[in-house]
């Protein structure tokens, strides 16, 4: 049984944790998904930008068990935009599960995925990410930080396959390892699937965009602990998918 069969699309979704959520049955073309965990002070900026992009049919924020009012800030930032849906998970499930939950809750054939803590994001960045996929020039785009913060620029230069800024055809998610995609392994599972299946992947430079270095938003040693957890989940995903062998040769070829 495929993962998608577990949650009928366009119907009531009961995430692990028991909070009922619903997205209306409709025929959207492009949905933006923003997984968020305790992102007050950051999520509002991202939602505000997305509300300025008319090409988006749905804006889905997954409040992944936040305790700081993340979902409420997203609602306030939307200024009543009817495209916004908040999926609230009662306990933190991790980034991968949050993204998969949103995927199950939308009928859109194209997905835009963005991190909740992006800084200096502009509407034109979003349009540059979605255009190659919507026009059939690429199966997936990946957004890489460029001339924003030297630390995050360096991170994306060294490990571009870990970026959380992507647009892709939704049906491609049927081909990723759902087990490997849990937590912070989601991007790794997606990267491996792209390499193994020969997807056309196009890089998009997000000039001026960055996010806080990994340990700063959470603060102190707690943030360092989260960073260690993130990299352990990424490593686990690589081991489970054996994707590291094909990374340099196959994954990020230019769309032609």
Predicted stretch roles:
Residues 90-106:
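Glycine-rich, basic loop-to-helix element that forms the pyrophosphate-binding segment
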Residues 111:
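Short aromatic/hydrophobic "clamp" motif used to bind/position activated sugar donors
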């Amino acid at each position: 049984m495929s993962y998608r069969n577990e949650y009928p699309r366009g119907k009531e979704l009961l995430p692990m944790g028991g909070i009922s959520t619903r997205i209306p049955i409709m025929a959207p073309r492009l949905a933006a998904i923003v997984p968020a965990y305790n992102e007050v002070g950051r999520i509002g900026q991202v939602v505000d930008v997305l509300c300025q992009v008319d090409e988006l049919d749905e804006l889905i924020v997954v409040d992944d068990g936040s305790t700081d009012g993340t979902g409420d800030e997203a609602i306030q930032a939307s200024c009543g935009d009817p495209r916004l849906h908040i999926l609230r998970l009662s306990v933190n499930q991790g980034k991968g599960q949050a993204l998969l939950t949103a995927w199950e809750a939308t009928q859109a054939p194209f997905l835009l995925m963005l991190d909740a803590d992006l800084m200096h994001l502009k509407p034109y960045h979003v349009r540059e990410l979605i255009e190659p996929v919507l026009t059939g020039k690429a199966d997936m785009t990946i957004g890489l930080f460029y001339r924003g913060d030297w630390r995050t620029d360096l991170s994306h230069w060294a490990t571009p396959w870990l970026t959380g800024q992507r647009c892709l055809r939704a049906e491609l998610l049927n081909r990723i390892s759902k087990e490997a995609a849990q937590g912070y392994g989601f991007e790794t599972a997606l990267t491996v699937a792209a390499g193994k299946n020969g997807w056309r992947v196009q890089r998009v430079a997000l000039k001026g965009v960055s996010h806080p270095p990994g340990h700063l938003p959470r603060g102190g040693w707690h943030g360092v602990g989260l960073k260690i957890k993130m990299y352990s989940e990424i490593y686990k995903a690589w081991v489970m998918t054996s994707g590291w062998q094909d990374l340099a040769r196959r994954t990020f070829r230019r769309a032609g």
